[in-house]
A protein has these predicted regions:
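Catalytic core of pol beta-like nucleotidyltransferases
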Residues: 1-18, 23, 34-42, 51-182
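Glycine-rich beta-strand-to-loop/alpha-helix junction loops that act as flexible
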Residues: 30-32
Length: 182
């Protein structure tokens, strides 16, 4: 998962290369960038980082991305494949000028094997799921005939209920914005 099935746009490739060098760490990519339902310059790129020092990595990400700590979300995630519970942090980074969106998840190194098992399990989808995801994304990204709410609702049904048979247990906790940032 250090490489991707689909070619990243050149800006995204350069972004991850520079950030990987800056952090002295590897990215592991998952989600649509690894599947047939990836839409270049529309789909976000999901990436995992594993580290022994999450707080240090978050500080480095803050510096590189030019974001505040409260923009990171803490989360708890129940992995279905290994029945483990992991904790981590997530940042959604948007560069509108380059039509680039990424979600980077930061986990402790000890959870790496379990998280990768979970994420690899959704790299190869049944044909009918891929087909419906491509139709859904075409309606949303290319034709603009469905709302973000509708898109998210049906994607959740396809990816969670039709693959896992249940909802993904993922709880995000926003880090509150300090009063002096307002």
């Amino acid at each position: 998962m250090e490489t991707t099935k689909n070619e990243m746009p050149s800006y995204a490739k350069a972004f991850f290369y520079k950030l990987s060098k800056y952090l002295d760490n590897k990215f592991y990519f998952y989600g649509s960038i690894q599947r047939n339902d990836y839409f270049p310059k529309s789909s976000d790129i999901d990436a995992d980082l594993f580290t022994d020092n999450e707080q240090s990595t978050i500080l480095k990400l803050q510096n590189f991305l030019g974001v505040k700590k409260y923009q990171f979300r803490r989360f708890v995630y129940k992995l279905h494949k290994t029945n483990k519970i992991v904790r981590g942090h997530k940042i959604k980074y948007i560069d509108a000028d380059n039509n680039f969106i990424t979600e980077i998840s930061i986990y402790n190194e000890k959870d790496k094997d379990n998280v990768l098992i979970e994420h690899n399990s959704k790299n190869i989808l049944p044909f009918y799921i891929s087909f419906f995801l491509i139709i859904l994304k075409t309606f949303y990204y290319n034709l603009g005939i469905i709302s973000n709410t509708t898109y998210t609702y049906y994607k959740k049904i396809l990816m969670n209920y039709m693959i896992e048979g249940e909802d993904v247990e993922f709880v995000g906790i926003d880090i509150l914005e300090p009063a002096h940032y307002k």
